[in-house]
Amino acid sequence: MVRVAVVSGRRAVLATVAGACMVLTGCSSMQQPDVEQAATTFEESGADPATRCELLAPATLVEFEEKESASCAEAIEDVPLEGGEVESVEIWGGDAQVRLSGDTLFLTETHAGWRITAASCQSRGEAPYDCEVEGP
């Protein structure tokens, strides 16, 4: 009987873990439209600089303005934002990566919604991405 209890206990634990994974995966898929919306709005060619700056995470905004020695609204106009179609979205916890046909962006979930932590990023293989806009 002890063996049955242990086996049943393992099954219960496995079922709980499997259920938690399904719930967590479901949460990621539910967040995907919000992540995509933030990324594509930031990259839209017609987006005004103020809108782009509002979509930056607070620490990224501060870092970007300090690096550029200018207001975000002035400096963001010089950043090459290639945009394009969404190719993939990866969400892990409160962070995300959106790959567009012309750019890669990184986002974080804040109390105000999904915000950009890095944009205009180029892959460097095994090295970290090289980004024109990035936070600490």
Residue ranges with predicted function:
Residues V2-V17:
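Bacterial N-terminal signal peptides that target proteins for export
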Residues T104-G135:
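Short beta-strand edge/turn micro-motifs at domain boundaries
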Residues S28-Q31:
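Bacterial signal peptide processing site
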